[in-house]
Amino acid sequence: MGNQTSRLIFPAKPDYIVALRLAAAAVGNKAGLNIDEIDHLMLLTSQAFNLLMLEGSKHIEADITENGGSLEISFSAVEYHDGQVETESRNVLKKALLKSLTRKCCMIHKGRIVACVAAGALGDSDMRTYGRQV
């Protein structure tokens, strides 16, 4: 089976985290992840969504790609609100939480978060969560 990508666009509001978690869980189940891996995937998805949501975007786009048992979730935050940027201390805490849930997390800063790349800590499963703002 080849790459299958689903693109979902959500308003950057907490109510939509549940819908994104369910979509990620469905794709994870289809890709053959076990229940613990799906739970971890849902947690990473929530944290990445929260991180971008609170940065001041109006919408968050999530691309979920399944390719023969591996998953990749890419997030893009679009249409920033002016003047609604969180304090750096809150950003540091959120980034630390996301990093603690993953094997590797690289952050690039330029006033706001430019990119967060994290590889899931699931042993044999190849799961990546990417958060980036464009």
Listing of model-derived features with the role each one plays in the protein:
Residues 1-43, 54, 132-134:
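Bergerat-fold GHKL ATPase/HATPase_c domain
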Residues 48:
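Hydrophobic residues in the alpha-helical elements that line and stabilize the ATP-binding pocket
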